[in-house]
Amino acid sequence: QDSASPIRNTHTGQVRGSLVHVEGTDAGVHTFLGIPFAKPPLGPLRFAPPEPAEAWSGVRDGTSLPAMCLQNLAIMDQDVLLLHFTPPSIPMSEDCLYLNIYSPAHAREGSDLPVMVWIHGGGLTMGMASMYDGSALAAFEDVVVVTIQYRLGVLGFFSTGDQHATGNHGYLDQVAALRWVQKNIAHFGGNPGRVTIFGESAGGTSVSSHVLSPMSQGLFHGAIMESLVALLPGLITSSSEVVSTVVANLSRCGQVDSETLVRCLRAKSEEEMLAITQVFMLIPGVVDGVFLPRHPEELLALADFQPVPSIIGINNDEYGWIIPKLLLAIDPQEERDRQAMREIMHQATKQLMLPPALGDLLMDEYMGSNEDPKHLMAQFQEMMADAMFVMPALRVAHLQRSHAPTYFYEFQHRPSFTKDLRPPHVRADHGDEVVFVFRSHLFGSKVPLTEEEELLSRRVMKYWANFARNRNPNGEGLAHWPLFDLDQRYLQLNMQPAVGQALKARRLQFWTHTLPQRVQELRGTEQKHTEL
């Protein structure tokens, strides 16, 4: 029944969805929005692991978008997100543990379609499921798409480092959503034995963390990490102190023992919590001994995880525009001389949690003795892209490829609709591939794609969905995408996809050998000084 208001069962009750049509295909899609996968994390459940959702009677309405989790909406400012329209007004609430499902209208219990679960990005401090519309992917590729939400910022990642607030609650929310999918997705025509998790930016970090977490084992069977992995210093820390100290001060709860601090924070209103959480542009997950038994670096190095087939990739200009504007508040169009650059390098090494003395080594490596301000800025951007995105992604690919099939890509196409929205020298910026994965921009808005771009989007969707179906992105009518193995071949994703080899191999040497050696030496000298 290709019904206009489909009703499906879940283990907590029935839900009614709606029928949507996707331009360019006859396939209808059933959408079920705002299904609860956990109990609202309110009151005593603030800073606690998620609890199972409660049952409801009657049929729940699944036709409107769920509230987003608490976040700083000012950052989601339209300029930065390149929105040329006003996003739908979506309420914000601490009660935000909901997911959206997009399933082909013909899908029935027993259809056994592959399932793709999207984890949104946003530095673990912002974003929402509803920014991403899964209907095109569902319609064109005959897969069930699920987009999930998780607690953000302080509410999702504050930790006292002990049992009073263990931290990673946002990650535990994601695990709860994946468990919900295992239990219920068959009712929507999905196959719980064929689940791929995919995400971009902090969503990629999340996916990468699930690959490493013993808690998530068996909840998914393939992983796609777009632009970020579990190794970005700003998104993972071994110690909860930095965040908890800031929170203790901002909340005026003071430097008290953890039990008192958590009690004090639980008594704060939603508005007060929002004011505290808005301070963080990024917030790190923490090595909690449960979700992450050890630091991701160690888990990867020791191969102490259950590998799954993976696609890992980056864009060719990750630090082109949106990230420097958000994180360093610098305008990449401003030219700076070497001295000014040195200052910025100093700030940047701090952000990357590297010893400040390494700034000069990085300048030598990336800028040589060049004095041209344009060149200096471009090289600074390349260095930051390498440090935050490219090198971590390559390292994870190298560490995973010996355990499970791994495919690597570099996305190289600059979307035509951005040409008036940012400077001409920006290539494929952070987040640019997402438009092609979903064939729509944020909140499902149609952006004008050229015919070639439509084709590129169909290709990207096909690679991603083939991977969800067969753990291998290759298929008829697509340029061959080789495994990332000893010869380090990868796919250059653009209008004419081609195979590349050994992406940035020399730089990888620099980041994995030269730099750590220098860090050791510097720490050694510091050691000596302290001893003297």
From Swiss-Prot:
Disulfide bonds: C69-C96, C253-C264
Catalytic activity: a carboxylic ester + H2O = an alcohol + a carboxylate + H(+); cocaine + H2O = ecgonine methyl ester + benzoate + H(+); 2-(5Z,8Z,11Z,14Z-eicosatetraenoyl)-glycerol + H2O = glycerol + (5Z,8Z,11Z,14Z)-eicosatetraenoate + H(+); prostaglandin E2 1-glyceryl ester + H2O = prostaglandin E2 + glycerol + H(+)
Top EC class, one word: hydrolase
Gene Ontology MF term list: carboxylesterase activity
Subcellular location field: Endoplasmic reticulum lumen
Keywords: Disulfide bond, Endoplasmic reticulum, Glycoprotein, Hydrolase, Lipid metabolism, Pyrrolidone carboxylic acid, Serine esterase
InterPro entries: AB_hydrolase_fold (IPR029058), CarbesteraseB (IPR002018), Carboxylesterase_B_AS (IPR019826), Carboxylesterase_B_CS (IPR019819), Type-B_Carboxylest/Lipase (IPR050309)
Signal peptide annotation: none
GO biological process, one term: lipid metabolic process
Residue positions where Pyrrolidone carboxylic acid is found in the record: Q1
Cross-referenced SUPFAM superfamilies: alpha/beta-Hydrolases (SSF53474)
Gene Ontology cellular component annotations, sorted alphabetically: endoplasmic reticulum lumen
Presence of the UniProt keyword Endoplasmic reticulum in the record: yes
Residues the record marks as carrying a glycan: N249
Family indicated by similarity: Belongs to the type-B carboxylesterase/lipase family.
Biological role stated in the UniProt entry: Involved in the detoxification of xenobiotics and in the activation of ester and amide prodrugs. Converts monoacylglycerides to free fatty acids and glycerol. Hydrolyzes of 2-arachidonoylglycerol and prostaglandins.
Cited PANTHER family: CARBOXYLESTERASE
Assembly and oligomerization: Monomer.
Name by which UniProt lists this protein: Cocaine esterase
Highest classification ranks of the organism: Eukaryota, Metazoa, Chordata, Craniata, Vertebrata
